[in-house]
Amino acid sequence: MADNLVIVESPAKAKTIEKYLGKKYKVIASMGHVRDLPRSQMGVDVEDNYEPKYITIRGKGPVVKDLKKYAKKAKNVFLASDPDREGEAIAWHLSKILELDDSKENRVVFNEITKDAVKESFKHPRGIEMDLVDAQQARRILDRLVGYNISPVLWKKVKKGLSAGRVQSVALRLVIDRENEIRNFKPEEYWSIEGEFRYKKSKFTAKFLHYKNKPFKLKTKKDVEKVTAELDGDKFEITNVNKKEKTRNPANPFTTSTLQQEAARKLNFKARKTMMLAQQLYEGIDLKRQGTVGLITYMRTDSTRISQTAKDEAKQYIEDKYGKDYLSNRTAKGKQGDQDAHEAIRPTSTLRTPYEMKAYLTRDQHRLYKLIWERFVASQMAPAILDTVALDVTQNNIKFRANGQTIKFKGFMTLYVEAKDDKDNEKENKLPNLSKGDEVTATQIEPAQHFTQPPPRYTEARLVKTLEELKIGRPSTYAPTIDTIQKRNYVKLESKRFVPTELGEIVYEQVKDYFPEIIDVEFTVNMETLLDKIAEGDIGWRKVIDNFYGSFKLDVERAEEEMEKVEIKDEPAGEDCEVCGSPMVIKMGRYGKFMACSNFPDCRNTKAIVKTIGVTCPKCKDGDVVERKSKKNRLFYGCSNYPECDFISWDKPVGRDCPKCNHYLMEHKKGRSSQVICSNCDYKEEVQK
C-alpha cells in the first residue's frame, strides 16, 4: 500500500493524476459527493440554529467503506477535489467521514490537470477553507428550505410531483415575462425607402435618412409619398464622404457562461452537453505516448484572468504561426468580482493544437476543444482594423445614406470570430470609391412596409447570458437550472426557443402570489451577494439563513391556509377511445401532453398526440404526414399509417412534386436558412413565403 492516499471526485481524474504522482501515491475516486441532506426529510433543524443533518448518500456505502479502508492504511490523506465551493465542501465531508485531523494541511487544489500543475500543488497543501464550505452549505440549506416547504403546498393545491426552487423560479419568470411581452405586443406600422444607385459600372444601395435636412420617420404610406413626391429624376449628388478606421478587439477567453453561449450558437450544444464534454477535456484525455493529459483548465469559472505562462506560450505560437504583426499589445483586464481567483477556460498548452488532438478526441470533444483553443489564442492576438465609409446621397434636400466596411487587417479574425445570438441578414455593401460632388444615378427607389416585431423568445444561450448578467446563480448552476425547468415540463423548446407550458404558468402564478421573494430578481441577486460574503468570511451563514427564513415561514403558513386548489381540467381530444368507445381527453404528463381515455382507471388506453402538417404522405398517398420526435428530441416526419407505411424523413415534405422528375419535394434546413429540394435530382428552389 502506498504511503499517500489522494481522493478526487471521478475515476477519470484519478487515473490521470495517479500517473503523474508515481508509486508512492494511491489515487481513488469518491464518485462526487458522499454526504448530503436526506431525501426523506428536510434534514435541517430550524429549532437548533439551522443545524444540517448529513447522511451518507444512498448507494455510496461501498465507496465510503473503501475510502475508510485505504485511509486507515495511509500515512497521509490528501483531498484533491475541484477548486471551487462545491469541491471544498466535498473535501470537508470526506474529512468528517474519514475522521481526519482538522489541523493538518491536506487540501490540494489545481486549476489544470497537467503533470507540472499537479506536482506543484502537492508542494503547497493547505487546510480546508471553511468560509467556502459555509457558502456551499448555506446555498444547499437555503435551497432545501425553499424546496421542502413550497413543493408540498404545490402538490396539495396544484398537482403531485411539482417543485419550486430559488434559482429555477427566477429562470421560469424570465421565460414567462418574455412570453407576456410577446402576447401584449402591438405591432406598429413603419416604412423604409431603399435606393439602388449606379456609379460607372458599380452599383450600391443606400437607405433614406433625411427629409429637408432633418430626420423624418416614415410611419405610413403617406409619409413615403410625401418624400418620393419631392424626388425629381434619377440624378443624385454625393454630398458627404466620411471615412474612418475602426479597430475591433477580440473577445475575452471563455468563462462558463460564455462557453455555454458560444457552444449553443456555433455547435448547437445544450448547456449540459457542453459541461459534460468540458469535464472530460479537463479530467484527462489519453494521448497515447504522451500519457493522459487534461487539455483544458477548470471549466466552472467566471474569471477572464490568464496566467502569464499561458500568455507567453500563446504569444510565441502566434509569432511563429502568423508573425509579429499579429501579436496583441493590449493589457486584458479580468472581470471585477471574479469568484475564487480562477483562470478563464483555456487550453493547458497552446502547442496542443486542435489539429494534433483530433486523433485522440471524439467528434464532439474535438469541436468543443477547437472552440476553446481558438477563442483563447484569438484573445491574445492583435485587433482587426476595419475601414468604414458612410456616403450621403442627396437630391432636393432628401438624403440617403450608404454604409460600407472593408477589412484592412484581419488580426484575430484570421483565426476566430465570435458568433451572435441574432445575426442580421444584411449583405455586405461594398461601396465604389466616390468623392464629394460626384454624381450617381438612381436605378431603383423601393419603398417597403414593415411592422415592429415583438422581443424574441429566449434561446438557451440568451437565457444563460441573462442569468449571468443579472448575477443569478453561479457558473455551476446555469446548466442544471435550465435542465430542471425543462424536466418539470414548466417550459418547452420550440424552434430552439423557450416557451412556457400551461403547467409552468400555473406554478409561476401560485409562487408569485404567495412567495413573491422567490421569483424576485433583486432578492435572488442580493442572496447571491450574501453567499459571496459568506465565502469571503464577512458574514456567518446561519445569520443569512435566519434572516431569510423568518418571513419565508410566514409565507408558507399563509399559502397553506389561503392558496386555492387549482384544478387542471382535461381538454377534450375530439375523438373516441378505440378500445372502449369513451371520449379521449388530453392530459398533462411529465413529458408534455398526451391522449388518454376518460374512462380511466377502467380503461388505460393512452396514445401520443400527433401534429399533422397538412400534407398527404408522398409514399402511400393515403396517410397524413405527421411530426414526430426522436429519442434525442429531434423533429422528424412520418406517416400517420405507420407501421403499415414506413415513410420517414428529417426534411419536411411540402406537398408538391418536382417539376423535373415528379419526385416529392422537401424543405431542407441548413443552419438558419431553408431551401426546397428534390432528394431524387438536383432541383432546388427558394421557400415560398
From Swiss-Prot:
Sequence ranges assigned to domain Toprim in this UniProt record: 3-113
GO cellular component terms given for this protein: chromosome
BP terms from Gene Ontology: DNA topological change
Cofactor entry: Mg(2+)
Domain of life: Bacteria
Catalytic residues, chain numbering: 298
Catalytic activity, EC: 5.6.2.1
Residue ranges, annotated region (Interaction with DNA): 163-168
Similarity field: Belongs to the type IA topoisomerase family.
HAMAP family: Topoisom_1_prok
UniProt xrefs under NCBIfam families: topA_bact (TIGR01051)
PANTHER family: DNA TOPOISOMERASE, DNA TOPOISOMERASE, TYPE IA, CORE
Function: Releases the supercoiling and torsional tension of DNA, which is introduced during the DNA replication and transcription, by transiently cleaving and rejoining one strand of the DNA duplex. Introduces a single-strand break via transesterification at a target site in duplex DNA. The scissile phosphodiester is attacked by the catalytic tyrosine of the enzyme, resulting in the formation of a DNA-(5'-phosphotyrosyl)-enzyme intermediate and the expulsion of a 3'-OH DNA strand. The free DNA strand then undergoes passage around the unbroken strand, thus removing DNA supercoils.
Name listed for the protein in its UniProt record: DNA topoisomerase 1
Organism listed in the record: Staphylococcus haemolyticus (strain JCSC1435)
